[in-house]
Amino acid sequence: MAVSARDYWDLTKPKVVALIVFTALVGMFLAIPGMPTWLQVRTGALGFLGIWLAASAAAAINQLLDAKIDAQMARTSWRPLVVGKVRPAQVLAFASVLIVISMTILVVWVNVITAVLTFASLIGYAVIYTVYLKRATSQNIVIGGLAGATPPMLGWAAVTGLPTSADWINASLLVLIIFIWTPPHFWALAIFRRADYAKAAIPMLPVTHGVPHTRKQILVYTVLLAIVTLLPVAVGMSGVFYLGGAVVLNAVFLWYAWRMLDPPDELFSMKMFGYSVVYLMALFAFLMVDHLLLPWVR
């Protein structure tokens, strides 16, 4: 049976990658004072493409290495490799082509630092997290979350090359936001899907330490996240427009985290999971709008 374009598209986890590359795009905009030049737009567009292709390759490799686990979980049992729509060799070839194209674009038309950081992130997620951390420790998503948190820095590097310590610090603040956001985001899903993870012998926190403990950890990380999201204002990267948006978004997220301690029903954790996605997209949208459109309110 021939492999369809949709099957290859599904291998890239398009919804997950869309959020990843959006944060990379915001990193690009925040790296540039004022409006970008044509050269910066060109470099940024190529950087965006290279990052997107690398993230897509990482997603495909993740599905290749996790095929046996995916087959045991309701959430992932439909994936193309699991149901036999594609063969492992085809997935490997597809991911390899994406990596080669991505690295070529980044090295030749963007800059080497972006290529190095992007490749390191790919290895961090597709290999270190997927092969080792995911199966080894209940803190898998905390430690492995660093690889998934780097896209804003990749975007920043694409348009600047990270020439100064200020560039590294500011880009790192954006990475820190996603790094702290990842545990409450993923643990909310893991609570709802804990039976699947237990069946697949994956030591997610709700499986190893129980749901009540996980709920408390979600609250701790959400409080920490609310604090961390104020850092862009503290260092002068963002102004009052972002601050107002961050305060509202954090207030709702904190309410979800507090309510998770005694949820009204089993589905509440999925409601928090859904909000966490909206939260991150909106937070980074506020960062971008504050930077580009409303400088006069700072």
Swiss-Prot record:
It is a multi-pass membrane protein. Gene3D superfamilies: UbiA prenyltransferase. Converts heme B (protoheme IX) to heme O by substitution of the vinyl group on carbon 2 of heme B porphyrin ring with a hydroxyethyl farnesyl side group. It holds the Pfam family UbiA. Signal peptide: none annotated. CDD domains: PT_UbiA_Cox10. It catalyses: heme b + (2E,6E)-farnesyl diphosphate + H2O = Fe(II)-heme o + diphosphate. One of its GO terms (cellular component) is plasma membrane. It is found in: Cell inner membrane. Carbon 2 of the heme B porphyrin ring is defined according to the Fischer nomenclature. One of its GO terms (biological process) is heme O biosynthetic process. PANTHER family: 4-HYDROXYBENZOATE SOLANESYLTRANSFERASE (PTHR43448:SF7), PROTOHEME IX FARNESYLTRANSFERASE, MITOCHONDRIAL (PTHR43448). This is Protoheme IX farnesyltransferase. HAMAP family: CyoE_CtaB. One of its GO terms (molecular function) is protoheme IX farnesyltransferase activity. Belongs to the UbiA prenyltransferase family. Protoheme IX farnesyltransferase subfamily. Pathway: Porphyrin-containing compound metabolism; heme O biosynthesis; heme O from protoheme: step 1/1. Its EC number is 2.5.1.141.
